[in-house]
Amino acid sequence: MKCYFFGTNLHEQKLISRQGLISFTVPDYGVLFRAQYIGNRYECEYAAGIALIRFLQLNMEHFDGKPITLMTDSPIVVYQVNNKLAAINSLQKFRDLFLFYKRKLKFDLQWVPTKMNRAEMGLEGLAVNKNSPRFNFDIFDESTRRKTRPHRNADESVQIS
């Protein structure tokens, strides 16, 4: 079963750690997930893959026994995880976590051109599957938790003039 992931930051200078987007899709089940993520381009790419892996792990009853191939347009993630390129220090924890899950869940990781990465595309390329099972999306933990900005307390009043 092919599963796709995509991550990017939304700043024109992609290596600056700013607001980004992570996305994954499981087309066979009509699943599309998107969330904001703070990080540079490569951190967002890794976070998208880790979010997909955690989704697969949480919902293994729907994927067990099926060969799983993760597809991404990130050559950095593919080459580092497949040991063709050394990971720089800032990406080491992401790569190590990816390798841990790869050994545990036994999936393949392949590069795909951006125009074929279904997680990067809009909704029009995703079919609705009315028979899709109910999935658990509780995929964030401390290593990939979305960073949030402090919110005002609910009891604080706002003055409008």
Q: What is the meaning of each model-derived region?
A:
Residues 1-43, 55, 160:
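RNase H-like nuclease fold core
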Residues 2, 69, 108-110:
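A structural signal for isolated positions on well-ordered beta-strands in alpha/beta enzyme cores
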Residues 6, 45, 73, 120:
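Acidic active-site catalytic centers that drive phospho-/nucleotidyl reactions
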Residues 9, 74-76, 113-115:
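Short, flexible active-site-adjacent loop segments at beta-strand->alpha-helix junctions, enriched
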Residues 14, 80-161:
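C-terminal functional segments of enzyme domains
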Residues 32-70:
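Acidic helix/loop or adjacent segment enriched in Glu/Asp that either coordinates divalent metal
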Residues 68-78:
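Acidic/histidine-rich, metal-coordinating catalytic segments
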